[in-house]
Amino acid sequence: KLGWSPDVVHCHGWFTAMVPAYLKTAYKDDPTFKDAKVFYSLYEEDFANASLGTKYAELASQVDIDAADLAAYGSGSFVDLTKGALSFTDVVVKSDENIDPEIMSYIKDNNIRVFAPASDDDYEAFGDLYDEFVNEEVSA
């Protein structure tokens, strides 16, 4: 156990694509994560024409996640992995300008909140975003 509960779990990039699904399904009743919000950062990246395959979601479904919850992960392509992650995400952090148009359409169609900082160094804007979700003051 962590000994504390995060207010926000911020996932960065495609390799964290399953984390939002686990947090919102398998760990939804866990006292450590039940109130945590999921942020997912998008970057200008792609697998080109490669795919992790349909086995990717199949393997993940072996641990307390229903196959229906993983349907958005589809073929295991970069776009499908991202859409799967976004289906369990509270806030998208748009970290690059050139995000796949299909992903941006998915965000719009599903009314997912988008945070687009002026730069990755805009610490004040990130701080303000995180402050919206912090449940209580942290004392040092």
Predicted regions and their residues:
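Catalytic cores of nucleotide-sugar-dependent glycosyltransferases that transfer UDP/GDP/TDP-activated
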Residues: 1-140
